[in-house]
A protein has these predicted regions:
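Anion-recognition interface
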Residues: 1-363
Length: 363
C-alpha cells in the first residue's frame, strides 16, 4: 500500500492564529473535539489555547455573539499563539459572508490570522451515516433512496457538493482554509492526528505522545437490525397518534440493546449498485474539481470507487426470529416509557407490520 500524497496549505505554528475546526457533522467531529480537550495541557505547551469544555466560544459564535471571542483574543497571554475552537455546530453557520466578515475582522484587529478547517468525506458514506443518525434519533425521515434524492435535489437540504458548499471562502482569500480528506488512502488516517499534523503541532515528548480519546458509544450505528427497529418503532408510534417528538433523546434505548447483542457489527448500508452509481455520478464533476483545486490530485485517488455492499434488514425471516424480535421490542417499549394504555395497540400495529414481511417458504 502506497499512501496518496496530496497538497495542503503551509501552516506555521509560530504565526498567531484563530483556528476554527468546524466539523462537519458526522465526520469524526465528536472524536476530534473530545481528543483535543483531552490534550488541552499538551496543546497549551504548544501555545494553543483550546475552547473550554463548555464550548463557550463556539456556542457564542453560533449565536452571533462575538463578545466572548473578543475578550479571549484581547486577554490572551503571550504564552499562547493560537486559539483553537472545535465544534461541528459551526459547520454551516460560519459559511455566511457576514459571519466570516465578523470573525475575520475580529481576528485581524487583534493581530491574528483566521484559519478554518473541515474534514471531507465521500458523499455516499456521509449520506449513509446521517440517515442512520436521523433514524436512530426517531426523526421523520423518508426511505433511504428518497432521502438521497432530497439531499441531492432540494435547495433547503444540506449542500454536500463541496465547491458550492465552500464558495463563500473565495471572497476571503486571506482566510487559511484547510480541507482534510477522511480517507483510508492517506498516510495518516486518524483524523485527530491528521489535524494536529496539518496545524504544524509536534507530537508531545514522552512515550505516550498525544493522549488517546475516550471511546464513546454516543454515535455508534445500531446496525441494520437496530435501524429497522428504530424506523418501525417511530412509524407505529406515529400511527397510534402519539407524538414521535416525545421519543427525542431516547434513541439510546435501541442503541444500547444493539451494542449488547452485537448488532452494531453488522452495519446498515442503504446503497444498492444503481443508487450508488446515481449518487457518485451526481457529485463526480464537483468532487473532481474540488480535489484538483485543493489537493492537486484526483478525487478517485483519495476516494476510490467501491462496489455497492447493501446491508438492509427488512424484518424477521423465520418464526423463531419473529418471536425473538417481538420479545426485544417489548424491552424497547418499556425503555421508551410508552404510556401503558397504548402498549396493547402498539403491538397490534407492530404485529401487522411484521406480518407484511413475507416469510420464506418452509418456515
Amino acid at each position: 500500500f502506497v499512501p496518496t500524497s496530496f497538497a495542503l496549505p503551509q501552516i506555521n505554528s509560530d504565526e498567531r492564529m484563530l483556528w476554527i475546526h468546524a466539523g462537519p457533522h458526522k465526520a469524526a467531529s465528536s472524536y476530534v473535539t473530545e481528543r483535543l480537550r483531552k490534550n488541552r495541557a499538551a496543546l497549551a505547551t504548544h501555545g494553543v489555547l483550546m475552547d473550554g469544555d463548555n464550548n463557550l466560544l463556539a456556542n457564542s459564535i453560533a449565536e452571533k455573539n462575538y463578545q466572548p471571542l473578543e475578550q479571549a483574543l484581547s486577554d490572551l497571554s503571550s504564552d499562547f499563539r493560537h486559539i483553537l475552537i472545535s465544534s461541528s455546530s459551526l459547520d454551516t453557520r460560519i459559511l455566511k459572508r457576514s459571519v466570516l466578515d465578523n470573525l475575520n475582522n475580529l481576528a485581524l484587529s487583534h493581530g491574528f490570522k483566521l484559519g478554518i478547517s473541515y474534514f471531507i468525506r465521500d458523499q455516499q458514506s456521509w449520506l449513509n451515516s446521517v440517515y442512520c443518525h436521523r433514524i436512530r434519533r426517531f426523526r421523520e425521515t423518508p426511505d433511504f433512496p428518497d432521502y438521497c434524492d432530497y439531499i441531492m435535489n432540494d435547495r433547503d437540504s444540506w449542500d454536500i457538493a463541496y465547491p458550492s458548499k465552500f464558495k463563500v471562502f473565495k471572497l476571503f482569500p486571506e482566510i487559511t482554509t484547510l480541507f482534510l480528506p477522511l480517507s483510508k488512502q492517506v498516510a495518516v488516517t486518524d483524523p485527530f492526528l491528521a489535524l494536529v499534523a496539518a496545524l504544524d503541532l509536534e507530537t508531545p515528548q514522552g512515550e505516550d505522545g498525544w493522549l488517546k480519546g475516550e471511546s464513546s458509544k454516543q454515535n455508534i450505528q445500531p446496525g441494520a437490525k437496530g435501524i429497522w427497529m428504530s424506523r418501525l418503532c417511530r412509524q407505529v408510534v406515529a400511527e397510534l397518534g402519539f407524538d414521535p417528538e416525545r421519543l427525542a433523546r431516547k434513541g439510546k434505548v435501541i442503541r444500547d440493546l444493539a451494542i449488547e447483542l452485537g448488532w452494531d457489527r453488522d452495519k446498515f448500508d442503504g446503497f444498492d449498485q444503481a443508487l450508488l452509481d446515481r449518487v457518485s455520478g451526481f457529485y463526480q464533476h464537483s468532487n473532481e474539481a474540488f480535489a484538483q483545486e485543493y489537493w492537486g490530485v484526483s478525487w478517485q485517488q483519495l476516494f476510490p470507487t467501491k462496489p455497492a455492499a447493501s446491508s438492509i434488514y427488512s424484518g424477521p425471516q423465520s418464526e423463531s426470529e419473529r418471536v425473538e424480535m417481538r420479545r426485544l421490542m417489548v424491552r424497547v417499549i418499556r425503555g421508551l416509557q410508552l404510556p401503558l394504555q397504548l402498549r396493547r395497540r402498539y403491538f397490534k400495529l407492530y404485529d401487522a407490520a411484521v406480518e407484511r414481511v413475507v416469510l420464506p417458504s418452509g418456515h
